[in-house]
């Protein structure tokens, strides 16, 4: 997988940048509780969803109450009763309490696809605040590609990219894939081994 992503997408990625989990729900449980919740120093960190609505399945992935905060989107009205929602960067608040930013691409259940430009802006903001940008790519690019608008795959050491084999037609496999920097992969591997 690392070789394919390096060859096809030009990502600087090695096997040490990949962890497998018992499904993508397990992956998000690990990530949400690694970057959010009560810290050793007593501070509480939260998962920021820059768009709402977002996947309802995340609600059960935390060990604590009030783990999540979301932002109201800008809604673009399109012809024939259609709409698209976008990140409202003007009102997006990233503070000391933000432990990570998380977005699904495409968003479940609406199928909204965050644009490449929005994704790059979120990545820049996450970098600026020293927090990871987690992308739930269960339906997106580079695979399984169940996406109906233009979207360029994005990964760098500050991005945690999550994928799922079940969306490739292998639901019985219960295999989630996490692509991240080695420090995060080491933490996930340790959590996965318990």
Predicted regions located by residue number:
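Active-site PLP attachment segment
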Residues: 150-188
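Glycine/threonine-rich helix-loop capping motifs at alpha-helix boundaries
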Residues: 193-194
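Conserved core of the PLP fold type I
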Residues: 1-129, 134-156, 160
């Amino acid at each position: 997988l690392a070789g394919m992503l390096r060859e096809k997408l030009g990502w600087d990625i090695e096997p040490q940048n990949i962890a497998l989990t018992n499904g993508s729900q397990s992956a998000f449980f690990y990530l949400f509780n690694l970057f959010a919740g009560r810290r050793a120093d007593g501070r509480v960190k939260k998962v920021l969803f820059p768009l709402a609505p977002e996947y309802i399945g995340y609600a059960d992935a935390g060990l604590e109450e009030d783990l999540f905060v979301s932002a109201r989107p800008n809604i673009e009205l399109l012809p024939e009763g259609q709409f698209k929602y976008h990140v409202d960067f003007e009102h997006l608040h990233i503070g000391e309490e933000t432990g990570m930013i998380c977005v699904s691409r495409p968003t479940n259940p609406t199928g909204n696809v965050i644009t490449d430009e929005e994704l790059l802006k979120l990545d820049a903001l996450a970098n600026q605040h020293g927090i990871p940008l987690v992308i739930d790519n269960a339906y997106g690019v580079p695979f399984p590609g169940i996406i109906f608008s233009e979207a360029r795959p994005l990964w760098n050491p500050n991005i945690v990219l999550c994928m799922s084999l079940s969306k490739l037609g292998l639901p019985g496999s219960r295999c989630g894939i996490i692509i991240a920097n080695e420090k995060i992969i080491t933490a996930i591997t340790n959590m996965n081994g318990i």
